[in-house]
Structure formats: C-alpha cells, structure tokens
C-alpha cells in the first residue's frame, strides 16, 4: 500500500539470519526427514509477531497490527485468535501458536472487513501467495539447491508388502497423499515416506484415512476448555481432505491425542493441527504420528 497516502512512517529491520535459521532451515530439514512443514505458521510465531512486538517495545508502542485476516475475542480472561469475517481469506489457522502476551496487544483491522473491498483500494498491488522464500521456484528445485549430502537420489517405490512398483527421484521430494509425478496404479498414492532408507511406500487411498492423531509442540489457550469438550473441530491443511465432524482431545505423553469422529484423509507429519471451538482457536500443535502407519 502507498504508505504516504496514510501518512505512516516507515522503519525497516533486517531479520534475515533469524528467518533463515528459524524458518528456511526448518522447512528444508523437515522435508529431508520425510515431513511436510508449514513455514507460514512457524514464521508467524517465531519471526513476524515477536519481531514486531520487540520493535514496538523499542519505540514505546503498546499495540501492534498486521494485515492478517483474523479477529481477537476474549473469554474467561483469555484472548483467542478467532476466524475473520471473510471466511474465504481467513488466516486464523496460521496463527494458532501466538502466545497470550502477543495477543494481549494485537489489533486486527482486517478481521471484520471483506477482502474484495480492500482489493479495490489496492488494485495496483499483486496478492501474495505461496511460500515467499521459494520466490516462485518449484519446491523440489529449492530442495535440490539445499541438498548438501546428496540425499536426493533415485530410490524404490514399494507397496506395503515390499514389492517394487517403480523408482522415485528422491524420497524427500514427495509428500503423503501425492499422486502427481508417480506412475502408480489407479486409486493409489504415497502412504509413507522413509527418507533414511530413501524409499516411498504407495498404497490404496483408503490407507490414508486416519482417526487417531498424536500431536506435539502444543499450545492450548485453556486446557480445561479442550479436554473433555464435545464441540471441538480439528483443522488440518495440506494435500489431504479436512475431517468432518467433531474431535475428542486427550492429554498424551508427547502432547495431545486427538480422536476424530470422522477420519482425516492424508494428514502429514509436520503439518499443524488446529483446534476450533466455534469460531475461536482454542489450541493447536504439530502432527507427529497417526493411527495407521506402515513404517
């Protein structure tokens, strides 16, 4: 936006090294471990919001705001990330990991507006989409540029019985549920990835239906509100289809265990699982394991 039209002073701080370490390296390492990361979520909790808060502190400014589409609501003395009025552009899923000390000072100017009204004001600016640091490159080209150990090499595609089906270009280049770029039988997809052995397991799509999820790196706004509740919904983005119905959440050694009323299709380790109660984000975490696992 033309900041001059609003009379807003401009200050810039470089956080390149921190971004490289916290987001880009995390993204790369996750894929090389056979996981499917969500870099935007990590950037929000590790870079954008804490750096913005720190800069505001240095200037003696109490409140902070961005152009994200979400709202803040309060309940029981807690602040909650809440879905935006524009459901098509809602970004609450990517903000589940923001701590209370940040939410306490957040203003959400975009939370109650419809994006098409804003687009009319910004008609000369392209909408940002995708992973910013890829700069338009395919993800696999980026990963090849970061392959320092020559891990990306051809390997076997097998079925659950160990029968060879074909050859892949490097296990880290694929994700759970993927079909594109693989010569698989009709109705089959990637069901497991073993980067240590450089192999991919393929199988029927029904093998990707999971009801039980184990989630780590959790943040719950109020655990008593989540455990035992019967109106929690779990949202999982990525290549898979999001589960319908409600979810039951239980404490577990690794974080939380989620039992889905209806199965999720193709959830991938490394993806955020975000818990909603109505419009409010009540918690979330990173998917570690699911009930059916071939490896």
Placement of each model-derived feature along the sequence:
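Short, solvent-exposed secondary-structure boundary motifs
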Residues: 84-86, 176-187, 233-241, 264
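Basic, glycine-rich polyanion-binding accessory segments appended to enzymes
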Residues: 194-295
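Short, glycine- and charge-enriched coil/turn segments that flank and shape catalytic ligand pockets
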Residues: 59-60, 73-80, 146-153, 161-163, ...
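Anionic-ligand-binding alpha/beta catalytic cores of soluble enzymes and soluble regulatory domains
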Residues: 111, 116-221
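Core alpha/beta nucleotide-donor-binding catalytic domains of modification enzymes
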Residues: 2-123, 134-153, 189
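Short polybasic amphipathic segments
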Residues: 81, 154-157, 234, 273
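Short acidic, glycine-rich loop/turn motifs
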Residues: 85, 157-161, 236-239, 277
């Amino acid at each position: 936006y033309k900041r001059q039209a609003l009379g807003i002073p401009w200050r810039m701080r470089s956080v390149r090294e921190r971004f490289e370490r916290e987001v880009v390296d995390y993204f790369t390492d996750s894929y090389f471990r056979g996981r499917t990361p969500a870099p935007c979520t990590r950037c929000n909790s590790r870079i954008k919001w804490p750096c913005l808060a720190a800069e505001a502190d240095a200037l003696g400014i109490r409140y902070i705001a961005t152009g994200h589409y979400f709202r803040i609501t309060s309940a029981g003395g807690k602040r909650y990330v809440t879905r935006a009025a524009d459901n098509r552009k809602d970004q609450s899923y990517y903000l589940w990991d923001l701590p209370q000390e940040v939410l306490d000072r957040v203003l959400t100017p975009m939370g109650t507006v419809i994006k098409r009204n804003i687009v009319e004001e910004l008609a000369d600016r392209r909408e940002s989409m995708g992973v910013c640091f890829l700069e338009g490159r395919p993800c696999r080209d980026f990963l090849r540029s970061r392959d320092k150990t020559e891990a990306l090499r051809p390997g076997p595609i097998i079925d659950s019985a160990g029968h060879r089906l074909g050859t892949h270009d490097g296990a880290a280049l694929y994700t759970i549920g993927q079909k594109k770029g693989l010569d698989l039988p009709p109705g089959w997809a990637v069901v497991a990835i073993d980067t240590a052995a450089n192999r991919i397991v393929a199988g029927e799509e029904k093998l990707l239906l999971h009801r039980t999820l184990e989630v780590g790196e959790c943040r719950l706004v109020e655990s008593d509100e989540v455990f035992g509740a019967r109106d929690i919904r779990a949202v999982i983005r990525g290549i898979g289809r999001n589960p319908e119905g409600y979810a039951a959440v239980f404490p577990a050694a690794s974080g939380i265990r989620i039992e889905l009323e209806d199965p999720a299709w193709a959830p991938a380790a490394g993806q955020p699982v975000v818990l909603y109660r109505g419009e409010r984000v009540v918690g979330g975490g990173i998917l570690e394991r699911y009930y059916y696992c071939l490896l």
